[in-house]
UniProtKB/Swiss-Prot annotation:
It comes from the Eukaryota. Changing residue 389 to G: Loss of function and does not bind cdc27. Required for replication of the leading DNA strand and for completion of lagging strand synthesis. It is essential for cell cycle progression. This is DNA polymerase subunit delta-2. It catalyses: DNA(n) + a 2'-deoxyribonucleoside 5'-triphosphate = DNA(n+1) + diphosphate. The gene is cdc1. Keywords: Cell cycle, Cell division, DNA replication, DNA-directed DNA polymerase, Mitosis, Nucleotidyltransferase, Nucleus, Transferase. It is an enzyme of class 2 (transferase). The lineage of its organism: Eukaryota, Fungi, Dikarya, Ascomycota, Taphrinomycotina.
Length: 462
């Protein structure tokens, strides 16, 4: 018998949806950097004034001095030999290729030495930096920060310290209630990876049965305590080109690319049908929040737009009731908590600059920087906003979810009385992991689905 359960109220508080009438691409991307600098400058100025009260602040990077340390607020720009260049892509391939590969932007040799080229830029100009301090501090292109230092004989700025906006206080303090006898959970999953072969994995079937309450309970855990499932993108596997008899004899690299229109021979509807069936089954007993990822049929640039109802032939009947489609990234008001959720592109791109950093470290950095995706639009595509950078954080989340990560992890960040739970959600197709968050305490545990078993892990409260 399928379990039907009451839900936790969920509202998308900051819907980053772009209507067709709003979308114009004639403007330059410089505007988004200026908007970002304008929004974050007051916060950083306040933080830096407290950190360096006896140091002189200069209004422009071009005014830095050589005889004494001073500090300025600017946007960092990072140059590496392996970083993709869209102009080179267009010149060499006459097309634009999506950057979803895991290849890093920084070579191991450069990462070990810290010998990375940086520049600092504001409204008035740009100055080059020397030393490895910025790379050691985790700085990437697009981060707005205050830097303390002086100009050397070569006219480069020598950085001796940095200051970020930092984690600021919640406008509404988070409340937790550990006295509740019956815990209520939300479940988070990412990277279902439904594929072109049309064969659903046993793990996906187990997940459906578990969420519907038709799979034997795991230990003392009851699926009825799960009130909502959040799918953090990549429901579909990466597209694989389907070779046909006409193209099989064409040597690799010689096949003519179709530049206009859509090549219908390369489309396989099976993954979409599988996703539709999955949602139709799960939504009959539990509320679902569905976010697109880089492999799903949504816009390529951030913020990715919600999946179109036309893709969901069967499950669209649940839209407006138990099925909620959201943008990527998105802000959710979930019960008494404020949730920031992403499909993981922002964190995966940061790890390409700093391969040795974990997903949780990169997530914490975005909080310190007050920006969800600082590498946009340089190496992570986004819409060319003009008047406002919509990825600047105006609030701090209580819960920060990031999907499609290499492994599961969670960390509680405490700063000035704020408690923020960070959760990196791994790809389900590779790990079989379903993450559960107790909405009374924000403690985290996982359930792992395997072909022959379902295993509940020890609750994690760190």
């Amino acid at each position: 018998m399928v379990e039907v359960r009451h839900s936790i109220p969920c509202e998308e508080t900051k819907r980053l949806e772009l209507s067709l009438s709003q979308q114009t691409y004639s403007q330059q991307y410089a505007s988004i950097y200026f908007a970002r600098l304008t929004a974050l400058r007051p916060r950083i100025t306040e933080a830096a004034s407290k950190k360096w009260p006896d140091k002189q602040r200069l209004e422009r990077v071009l005014d830095v001095k050589s005889d004494e340390d001073c500090w300025v607020v600017a946007t960092a720009y990072m140059t590496t030999a392996l970083k993709p260049n869209v102009m080179n892509d267009v010149t060499q391939l006459h097309t634009i290729v999506t950057t979803t590969e895991e290849s890093p932007y920084v070579s191991p040799e450069d990462a070990a030495s810290g010998d990375i080229e940086y520049a600092l830029e504001d409204d008035y100009g740009r100055i080059d930096c020397s030393g490895s301090f910025l790379y050691d501090a985790g700085v990437v292109t697009g981060v707005v920060l205050a830097v303390l230092g002086h100009e050397d004989e070569q006219g480069r700025f020598v950085v001796v310290d940095v200051c970020f906006p930092g984690i600021f206080s919640h406008s509404i303090p988070m409340t937790t209630d550990e006295s509740q006898a019956q815990p209520e959970y939300i479940a988070a999953v990412s990277g279902l990876g439904l594929s072109n072969d049309g064969i659903e994995g046993i793990q996906v079937h187990q997940l459906v049965d578990f969420l519907r309450g038709t799979l034997p309970h795991v230990s003392s855990f009851s699926p009825s305590s799960i009130k909502r499932l959040i799918i953090l993108g990549n429901c579909l596997a990466p597209s694989i080109e389907i070779a046909d008899s006409a193209s099989a004899s064409v040597p690799i690299g010689k096949k003519k690319v179709k530049r206009y229109g859509y090549d219908t021979s390369a489309y396989n509807p099976n993954p979409t049908f599988q996703l539709d069936n999955f949602l139709d089954q799960v939504c009959s007993s539990i509320d679902v929040t569905l976010m697109p990822g880089p492999y799903d049929y949504s816009s390529t640039i951030l913020p990715q737009q919600p999946l179109h109802p036309a893709l969901l032939t069967k499950s669209k009947v649940w839209l407006g009731s138990s099925l909620q489609t959201v943008t990527n990234p998105t802000w959710l008001s979930l019960g008494n908590h404020f949730v920031l959720a992403t499909s993981g592109q922002n964190i995966n791109d940061l790890r390409k600059y700093h391969p040795k950093k974990s997903s949780l470290q990169c997530m914490e950095n975005t909080l310190l920087w007050n920006h969800i995706t600082p590498t946009s639009p340089d190496t992570l595509w986004c819409y060319p906003f003009t008047d406002k950078d919509t990825f600047v954080m105006e609030e701090m989340p209580d819960l920060y979810l990031c999907g499609n990560q290499p492994k599961f992890g969670c960390k509680t960040v405490i700063n000035e009385g704020n408690r923020i739970q960070l959760v990196s959600v791994p790809e389900f197709r590779k790990t079989g992991v379903l993450v559960l968050i107790n909405m009374h305490t924000l403690n985290v545990e996982i359930i792992q689905f395997r072909p022959m078993s379902v295993k509940a892990e020890t609750p994690i409260t760190s």
